[in-house]
Amino acid sequence: MAALLLGAVLLVAQPQLVPSRPAELGQQELLRKAGTLQDDVRDGVAPNGSAQQLPQTIIIGVRKGGTRALLEMLSLHPDVAAAENEVHFFDWEEHYSHGLGWYLSQMPFSWPHQLTVEKTPAYFTSPKVPERVYSMNPSIRLLLILRDPSERVLSDYTQVFYNHMQKHKPYPSIEEFLVRDGRLNVDYKALNRSLYHVHMQNWLRFFPLRHIHIVDGDRLIRDPFPEIQKVERFLKLSPQINASNFYFNKTKGFYCLRDSGRDRCLHESKGRAHPQVDPKLLNKLHEYFHEPNKKFFELVGRTFDWH
């Protein structure tokens, strides 16, 4: 029990992981949580593990790239403890000002051998996030899942459209966002999120490419097992996820998960049909991303089967 308590304290009190700005608050909070954790373990009430750990891996994006699917699939591994919600610690000032102690409190309880994973898709496109993540842990391993940029734009629009529909609020057609004065509206935020090379350059200012594993989101949807195997290797996890953990659901039209005899699929909001777009406008979209895609391929040293 003494060894367990010592391990718990060591896990939550890691001074080298405290960023410069919220250092004092973070350190005090970490020590406070260590004391609380000691009491919990002594009383035998620590749930699902012995301690909360700062994430050793973060899924940084991209929005509508398949981050939820990736997290759910990765959670099949027994050595992975995943945060349930998008924490938005590094990109929301209100959260970041609370310090690392607050961030730690958002993590799941886990065992020392487990890898804690957090996902917030907005991190990838937020200019201030890479430096903040680096300040916490320059050795952290990052997962980035990307899909065809044009398809990502349509999916981005679709999510916002349905959010408005559920609230019975009107929302303009996608053409109204994509076209302005007869030309492609390059100020549309969804287009900017798909300029992968711009955002990747920002991350590579702080992290070497070997610390960032890019998951092919299109392949993950079509054939998830090989992509998850690559993620296991990148994270140095033992190969525990099997092909039998995935099955194709004909009704939903995508792969679902099978874990310990239980089947589960992603939320019904995933896999929604995209709006019909005029082929000429779609071609303009493909042309717009052609050069940015080439720059991204050169940046990361690999290609993707995108339009």
Swiss-Prot record:
Cell location: Golgi apparatus lumen
The chain's disulfide connectivity reads C256-C265
Supply the name of the protein.
Answer: Heparan sulfate glucosamine 3-O-sulfotransferase 1
Using the UniProt annotation, give the residues that carry a glycan (glycosylation sites). Answer: N48, N192, N242, N249
Q: Which reaction does it catalyse?
A: alpha-D-glucosaminyl-[heparan sulfate](n) + 3'-phosphoadenylyl sulfate = 3-sulfo-alpha-D-glucosaminyl-[heparan sulfate](n) + adenosine 3',5'-bisphosphate + H(+)
Residues annotated for 3'-phosphoadenylyl sulfate binding in this entry: K64, G65, G66, T67, R68, R147, S155, Y255, K270, G271, R272, A273, H274
Q: Which InterPro entries match?
A: NST/OST, P-loop_NTPase, Sulfotransferase_dom
Report the family membership: Belongs to the sulfotransferase 1 family.
Keywords on this record?
A: Disulfide bond, Glycoprotein, Golgi apparatus, Signal, Transferase
What is this enzyme's EC?
Answer: 2.8.2.23
- Quote the PANTHER family the UniProt record gives: HEPARAN SULFATE GLUCOSAMINE 3-O-SULFOTRANSFERASE 1 (PTHR10605:SF16), HEPARAN SULFATE SULFOTRANSFERASE (PTHR10605)
Entries under Gene3D superfamilies matching the protein: P-loop containing nucleotide triphosphate hydrolases
Catalytic EC class: transferase
Q: Which domain of life is it from?
A: Eukaryota
GO CC annotations? Golgi lumen
Write out the tissue specificity statement of the associated record.
Highly expressed in the brain and kidney and weakly expressed in the heart, lung and placenta.
Listed under GO biological process in this entry are: glycosaminoglycan biosynthetic process; heparan sulfate proteoglycan biosynthetic process
Job of this protein: Sulfotransferase that utilizes 3'-phospho-5'-adenylyl sulfate (PAPS) to catalyze the transfer of a sulfo group to position 3 of glucosamine residues in heparan. Catalyzes the rate limiting step in the biosynthesis of heparan sulfate (HSact). This modification is a crucial step in the biosynthesis of anticoagulant heparan sulfate as it completes the structure of the antithrombin pentasaccharide binding site.
Q: Which organism is it from?
A: Homo sapiens (Human)
Q: Which residues form the signal peptide?
A: 1-20
Q: Which GO terms describe its molecular function?
A: [heparan sulfate]-glucosamine 3-sulfotransferase activity; sulfotransferase activity
